[in-house]
A protein has these predicted regions:
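Intracellular juxtamembrane helix-capping segments at the cytosolic ends
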Residues: 40, 128-143, 150-151
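Extracellular/periplasmic helix-loop-helix junction of adjacent transmembrane segments
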Residues: 36-72
């Protein structure tokens, strides 16, 4: 439905690119995942590896799952966005992304790697995909005269999120 996507009359469209940049800075922190690999492999033995610690191989795959789910969700979420609008999709993205962190944190606390996969990989990946398409599709429609500049601002945030997300 077009009324879910197009700005109302009198709305300042230049308020959207900074908000899109902020959203993409948050979800772009996924690219800082490699910084968290070493600590995740030493949860029990902080200084030296313990027998109950996770090995690096399974921990690295969590990022891959999140990126695959991002792509799949973005493909499906784009069509869904056409029906319900970017606000609704953006709110669902925020809940998925935040919920993914909560479930993933629970998995770390309980030493259950499958919960980290489910939380950060699947649920967080869904938040990534929906959070990616919502601002970009809005900017493309609201800036037909400056599509490249408007979407570039948002995508810049996705790449810059790794700088902010890495401690």
């Amino acid at each position: 439905r077009k009324e879910n996507i197009v700005a109302p009359d009198g709305y300042n469209r230049w308020r959207v690119p900074p908000a899109s940049l902020a959203i993409h800075l948050c979800i772009g922190s996924v690219y800082a995942w490699s910084v968290f690999n070493p600590p995740l492999t030493r949860l029990q033995g902080v200084v030296a590896p313990a027998a109950s610690d996770w090995s690096l191989g399974p921990v690295v795959w969590i990022f891959s799952v999140a990126i695959v789910v991002l792509g799949l969700t973005a493909a499906v979420g784009g069509k869904w966005l056409e029906k319900v609008g970017p606000r609704y999709v953006g709110v669902v993205a925020g809940f998925c992304w935040g919920g993914g962190f909560l479930v993933g944190s629970l998995g770390i606390a309980l030493q259950q790697l499958w919960l980290v996969y489910l939380g950060y990989g699947v649920l967080g990946g869904m938040g990534l995909g929906l959070g990616y398409v919502s601002p970009v599709s809005t900017l493309i429609r609201w800036f037909p005269d400056r599509r490249g500049m408007a979407t570039g601002m948002a995508i810049m945030g996705f790449g810059g999120g790794a700088m902010i997300g890495a401690p």
